[in-house]
Amino acid sequence: MLARAGVVKWQLVYTKQAKRDAKKLSAAGLRPKAESLLKILGENPFQNPPAYEKLIGDLAGAYSRRINIQHRLVYEVFEDKKVVKVIRMWTHYE
């Protein structure tokens, strides 16, 4: 899922749903954009740009970045463990 280029300072872990979403992204031709965002998360999950937003409601505590106009990469950050948990990589409006 994540290209091996560059130094990864944060460990990325993926939910089962995120792994399923990765297959959808590949089929939709969105894999390069998603890989670019994942690389940024591995280096610094709070880097801006690209912009991110803190989510509320059911996903309170998580963050979201745009893959495209419809789809978002949703993740949680565990600063104490230097872990980024990727929750979704498709729309979070379903």
For each feature predicted by the language model, list its residue ranges.
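A short, surface-exposed loop/turn module that caps and links secondary-structure elements
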Residues: 39-66
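Enriched for short, Lys/Arg-rich terminal
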Residues: 1-24, 28-36, 56, 65-72, ...
